[in-house]
Amino acid sequence: MRHQKSGRKFSRTSAHREAMFKNMAASLFKHELIKTTLPKAKELRRVAEPLITLAKVDSVANRRLAFARLRDNEAVGNLFTILGPRYANRPGGYLRLLKCGFRAGDNAPMAYVELVDRPVVAEEVAE
């Protein structure tokens, strides 16, 4: 029985799942807004939020821990230079999930994952 087992499988192997969430977290830290399915968005919080908490204290050891989890230098740089200082006084809850309808092909529920307190870009205001 599968009682008390946390985390979703998404019909993927553990390596595929781990790689998918590394890539999604790296994209989130680069662009600060991504669109994905709602279950993936909910599961992404478990990966991304601890990394932002880690980035609050900028040290070589923390950068190495973050790089081990993300494997992306640009994302780690953004995490420690931009996001860590931005959320230094926030005790958690760095991500916001916004439901945005259903995907055309398979009617999967979709959601935007964005970082709270992110600067609004002029292009997005025009939309």
Curated annotation (Swiss-Prot):
Check the record and name the SUPFAM superfamilies matching this protein.
Prokaryotic ribosomal protein L17
**Which cysteine pairs make disulfide bonds?**
none
Keyword annotations: Ribonucleoprotein, Ribosomal protein
Task: Decide whether keyword Ribosomal protein is in the record.
Answer: yes
Example of a GO cellular component annotation carried by this entry: cytosolic large ribosomal subunit
Lineage: superkingdom = Bacteria
Do you know which InterPro entries this protein is assigned to?
Ribosomal_bL17, Ribosomal_bL17_CS, Ribosomal_bL17_sf
| Biological processes annotated in GO | translation
List, in alphabetical order, the Gene Ontology terms for molecular function in this entry.
structural constituent of ribosome
Q: Quaternary structure?
A: Part of the 50S ribosomal subunit. Contacts protein L32.
For this chain, the family text in UniProt reads: Belongs to the bacterial ribosomal protein bL17 family.
- What is the name listed in the Swiss-Prot or TrEMBL entry for this protein? Large ribosomal subunit protein bL17
Give the lineage: Bacteria, Pseudomonadati, Pseudomonadota, Gammaproteobacteria, Lysobacterales
